Design a protein with these regions (language model features):
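The two-metal-ion catalytic cores of nucleic-acid processing enzymes
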Residues: 1-229
Length: 230
């Protein structure tokens, strides 16, 4: 069985640039692996597996990406209005206690909606950023129906339209970093950490911040091994 890559470990270091053709994608919150992990310990993670240009199997544990979506807000709103809304959402009965503090931050941006005729007008949106995908989905549910917040809209119910909420966090990260699902990526030397002990059966096992991954154009096909049985 020596021909199996997993049985031929390499003495890995972070002294070299790595180019990897992606074979597989996985994503998870830390809580999915250990139910005791909550709060700041419950982060969103992505695992990329692939083959590098030296034919080594590689597992890339990607950290630091925060799921987010947008809601449309009135054009006269300031950050203080969004703060009131965010605090009300954290206390909403639909939010499980484990996610109440996982709405990490928010900001106001101006964008042009993709749908509908708006001429060239720009509209205000609140960008809500979350610690993990569990909170990302939980907070969406609040906005799927009219919401009443005492200090907003005179205490009357208001429907906040969701935008880009259907884009899963892993796909969002791929788009942000311009990565193709089965394409090539580059990670520069010193930008990643070699996991010791390894977290996988791959020959190269590393952890890297998502901002250090770059999608690249490359026509070569990695030396991928396919296994099957009758």
């Amino acid at each position: 069985m020596d021909y199996l890559r997993g049985n031929n470990k390499v003495d890995a270091s972070n002294e070299e640039d790595i180019e990897i053709q992606i074979v597989g994608w996985h994503n998870y919150d830390d809580h999915e692996l250990d139910e005791e992990l909550t709060g700041e310990d419950n982060e969103f993670n992505v695992l990329i597996t692939g083959i590098d240009s030296l034919k080594r199997s590689v597992a890339v544990y990607v950290e630091g990406f925060k799921p987010f979506f947008f809601i449309q807000i009135p054009n006269d709103w300031k950050k203080s209005h969004v703060s009131i809304l965010a605090e009300a959402c954290k206390k909403h009965y639909m939010i499980d206690e484990m996610y109440c503090e996982d709405l990490e931050k928010f900001s106001i941006v101006k964008r042009k909606p993709f749908y509908g005729y708006t001429h060239d007008d720009m509209f205000k949106f609140a960008k809500l950023v979350f610690r993990n995908k569990g909170a990302f989905h939980a907070y969406q549910n609040i906005f799927r129906r009219p919401l009443r917040v005492r200090d907003l809209f005179g205490g009357q119910e208001h429907y906040y339209e969701l935008f880009e909420s259907s884009v899963e966090p892993m796909l969002r990260m791929m788009h942000v970093r311009d990565i193709q699902a089965s394409g090539w990526i580059r990670i520069c030397a010193k930008d990643y950490h070699v996991n010791k002990p390894s977290l996988s059966n791959c020959q190269y096992d590393i952890t890297v911040p998502y901002k250090k991954i770059v999608g690249i154009k490359k026509d070569a096909v990695g030396d991928i091994v396919f296994a099957g049985f009758d």
